[in-house]
């Protein structure tokens, strides 16, 4: 992160020396557990967490969880040492690798959010025509393209950072001259934040406009049906995209202020940079909360991870089988004593009386 590495805390006994490790430890713990559980929920066999057959949304959420987990495990612990220790202890290679992974996962998350916003727009606006395009195979190809683009855009950060000696201390700091650093920081803001947020805003804006543009009673009913069918995944991914914009926006804004505004180094500006970095890092541990709050099907699949949830589901199925009426089988089964038609004098069967009970096909449905 830009220039935060140059400034250490004033003293080990300062408030920051205590608060920073606590905040980073919470981010690490919540992010690791939360994204690990998201992976466990999505990788278990069963229907989509969003009740969409062949859902591409699950694949995109899985990719977001992988990117967030990689960021939490590989970047947050090392970044915490930058703010709490006076020197960099891990060598030049780790210095370069950590900052490469920071921007690699940032690009992967932003590009995935842009892809899923387009996916949701196609699902709502062209539900039939987009079926051939919105397949798990194409979603996996899109995920591969996301990581390829993320690797290309983040590759310059392999040389952007390096280690320098400052007296007896080794520091992990930006190694490029100012002109090149400014050009890359502006390009990162444009490609990793501004463009994905614009795509997400346009896609969800057109989606919401289409959902609410019903004309007449028939149009209103159709729009309400579309809202019910696409609401769970759409609301969740819209919330995730909004969180990304809110959490990463201050970080990019401060970098632009550093290059194009008045941003003198002081305790106040240091606190602002630290707060912006913590907010950006916290984005990786907030997404699992959104999934859990947005979808009852996601919560149900989460409960199935635990033995008590599986036992409760098994008992419910056994109780359902015990109370199922004997006549719930298809016509002609031994439990169905009622003939399916009216006997005629010649031994044949006539049509069902109109005022009689429900047809055998309806009775066969049983409790849902």
Curated annotation (Swiss-Prot):
GO biological process: adenylate cyclase-modulating G protein-coupled receptor signaling pathway; chemical synaptic transmission; feeding behavior; G protein-coupled receptor signaling pathway, coupled to cyclic nucleotide second messenger; galanin-activated signaling pathway; learning or memory; neuropeptide signaling pathway; positive regulation of transcription by RNA polymerase II
Covalent S-S links between cysteines: 95-172
Keywords on record: Cell membrane, Disulfide bond, G-protein coupled receptor, Glycoprotein, Lipoprotein, Membrane, Palmitate, Receptor, Transducer, Transmembrane, Transmembrane helix
SUPFAM superfamilies membership: Family A G protein-coupled receptor-like
Residues carrying sugar: 6
GO MF, one example: peptide hormone binding
Stretches assigned to the Cytoplasmic side: 42-57, 119-138, 206-236, 281-368
S-palmitoyl cysteine lipid sites: 308
Membrane topology (UniProt): Multi-pass membrane protein
Transport listed as a keyword: no
Chain ranges passing through the membrane: 21-41, 58-78, 97-118, 139-159, 185-205, 237-257, 260-280
Extracellular side: 1-20, 79-96, 160-184, 258-259
Subcellular location: Cell membrane
Region (Disordered): 317-368
Main location: membrane
A single cellular component GO annotation: membrane
Family: Belongs to the G-protein coupled receptor 1 family.
Role description: Receptor for the hormone galanin. Receptor for the hormone spexin-1.
Name used for this protein in its record: Galanin receptor type 3
């Amino acid at each position: 992160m830009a220039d935060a590495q140059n400034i250490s805390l004033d003293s080990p006994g300062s408030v920051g020396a205590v608060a920073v490790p606590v905040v980073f430890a919470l981010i690490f713990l919540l992010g690791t557990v939360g994204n690990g559980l998201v992976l466990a929920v999505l990788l278990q066999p069963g229907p989509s967490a969003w009740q969409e057959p062949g859902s591409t949304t699950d694949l995109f959420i899985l990719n977001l969880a992988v990117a967030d987990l990689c960021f939490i495990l590989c970047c947050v612990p090392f970044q915490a040492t930058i703010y709490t220790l006076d020197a960099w202890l891990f060598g030049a290679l780790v210095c370069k690798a950590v900052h490469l992974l920071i921007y690699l996962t940032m690009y992967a998350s932003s590009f995935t959010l842009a892809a899923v916003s387009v996916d949701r727009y196609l699902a709502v606006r062209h539900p039939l025509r987009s079926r051939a395009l919105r397949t798990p195979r194409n979603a996996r190809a899109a995920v591969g393209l996301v990581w390829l683009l993320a690797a290309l855009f983040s590759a310059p950060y392999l040389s952007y950072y390096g280690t320098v000696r400052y007296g007896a201390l080794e520091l992990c700091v930006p190694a490029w001259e100012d002109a090149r650093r400014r050009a890359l920081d502006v390009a990162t803001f444009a490609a990793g934040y501004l463009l994905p947020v614009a795509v997400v805003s346009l896609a969800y804006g057109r989606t919401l406009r289409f959902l609410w543009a019903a004309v007449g009673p028939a149009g209103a009913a159709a729009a309400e049906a579309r809202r019910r069918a696409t609401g769970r995944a759409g609301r969740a991914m819209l919330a995730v995209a909004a969180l990304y914009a809110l959490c990463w926006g201050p970080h990019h804004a401060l970098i632009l202020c550093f290059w194009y505004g008045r941003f003198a180094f002081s305790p106040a500006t240091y606190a602002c940079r630290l707060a912006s970095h913590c907010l950006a890092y916290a984005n990786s541990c907030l997404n699992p909360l959104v999934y859990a709050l947005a979808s009852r099907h996601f919560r149900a699949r989460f409960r199935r991870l635990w033995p008590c949830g599986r036992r409760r589901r098994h008992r419910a199925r056994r109780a359902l089988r015990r109370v199922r009426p004997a006549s719930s089988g298809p016509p002609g089964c031994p439990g169905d004593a009622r003939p399916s038609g009216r006997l005629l004098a010649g031994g044949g069967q006539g049509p069902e009386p109109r005022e009689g009970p429900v047809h055998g096909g309806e009775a066969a449905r049983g409790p849902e």
